[in-house]
A protein has these predicted regions:
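N-terminal Lys/Arg-rich, disordered targeting/topogenic segments
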Residues: 1-30
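Hydrophobic membrane-insertion alpha-helices, especially the h-region
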Residues: 28-52
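Alpha-helical transmembrane signal-anchor/signal-peptide segments
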Residues: 52-75
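Loop/turn elements at helix/coil->beta-strand transitions in domains of secreted/extracellular proteins
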Residues: 76-78, 101-103, 127-130, 286-293
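Second-shell loop/turn segments in exported
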Residues: 81, 106-108, 264-271, 281, ...
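Membrane-embedded segments
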Residues: 82, 86-175
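Secreted/periplasmic serine-hydrolase-like ester/acetyl group-modifying domain
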Residues: 150-288
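Substrate-gating cap/lid alpha-helix
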Residues: 299-321
Length: 321
């Protein structure tokens, strides 16, 4: 950086020069730009080919902005699906439209608690439609501060606070995410790839099991579909999907810093509070002529045995109804 010679006033009173010149180096800028563009294109194409080679394909990212776009599609008389991944994957919008005469709006989310969305719809004075709520007790009765509750709360918060820039960004992302496989945010980021390194956990570490990578696609209506490889009998991906749920739903041991009886009492109190809050939300919806249908979707084998043991029907489902 080359500065001009200080003026007489600056020499007397001090202070740096107020102007400077920065000469541009005489290098082949056009050629350098072409090289950079070629490197970026080559790297992008190579990464895309690699992602497709390991099984990935183009799909929309399930984020708060996409959820918000569907939430905005809810009309006063809409049929709305809320809850967890069972209501997300197990319900086909085309078939429901044929049977119900109206196309539902899909607001269920993987690993999410349906209560924040239920409460938000209850507060919407204009809504008097029908809610189909998927219930997995461990998720639906999750206390505040847990990941299932936070997923629902973040989505509802984004609906009420989404900026025009965030909304425009989601619309601009559609054509790219529908064509490019490596834009899978939740699985192909550097942070996620580092977590996949086969490094053994230290002794006594309580690390949650990792979900299988890329087994479903998502469209602009948030319809979730499993990829074809999931249907191949005996495939590694199918086995991983089948075997992940028991360790994922197995509760961790109670904390050692509090007596077990006291801990269980707090859990019971939290569930009781959730029953009370659900009752208030349902009464608001009923008072406007709306309907709500609670559904437990089919599950079997070891997962059903685990859920029946940890969240028995008599303590969760029956009181809910």
């Amino acid at each position: 950086m080359f500065f001009r010679k200080p003026s007489r006033a600056e020499q007397i009173h001090g202070g740096p020069p107020l102007e400077f010149e920065r000469p541009i180096p005489p290098v082949p800028w056009r050629g350098m730009a072409v090289v950079v563009v070629l490197v970026v294109i080559t790297a992008s194409v190579g990464w895309e080919l690699y992602c497709r080679a390991i099984g990935y394909g183009p799909t929309l990212n399930d984020n708060e902005d996409l959820w918000t776009l569907r939430r905005r599609a809810v009309t006063p008389e809409s049929i709305v699906i809320i809850g967890d991944s069972r209501g997300w994957f197990d319900l086909d919008l085309d078939e429901l439209q044929k049977g119900l005469g109206k196309r539902p709006v899909q607001l269920a989310m993987g690993g999410g608690c349906g209560y924040p969305v239920l409460a938000d719809l209850a507060k919407d004075e204009s809504f008097h439609g029908t809610i189909i709520c998927s219930v997995v007790p461990r998720l639906f009765f999750a206390p505040p501060g847990t990941p299932p509750m936070e997923r629902g709360e973040k989505a509802v918060k984004r609906f009420h606070s989404q900026t025009p820039a965030q909304r425009a960004s989601q619309y601009l992302a559609f054509p790219l995410e529908e064509q490019v496989a490596f834009l899978k945010q939740e699985e192909l980021t550097l942070d996620d790839l580092l977590k996949r390194l086969p490094i053994p956990n230290r002794a006594g570490a309580r690390v949650p099991p990792r979900l299988p990578p890329y087994f479903g696609t998502l469209d602009s209506e948030r319809r979730a579909r499993m990829i074809e490889e999931c249907a191949l009998p005996g495939s590694e991906l199918a086995q991983r999907i089948q075997q992940i749920w028991i360790p994922l739903f197995t509760p961790p041991p109670p904390p050692s810093y509090i007596p077990k009886e006291q801990f269980m009492a707090k859990i019971g109190e939290a569930i009781g509070n959730r029953f009370r809050d659900i009752t208030i939300a349902v009464e608001k919806i009923h008072s406007r002529g709306g309907k709500i249908v609670f559904v437990r979707f089919p599950h079997s084998g070891g997962l059903k045995e685990l859920e029946d043991r940890e969240t028995p029907r008599a303590k969760t489902w029956d009181p809910l109804l």
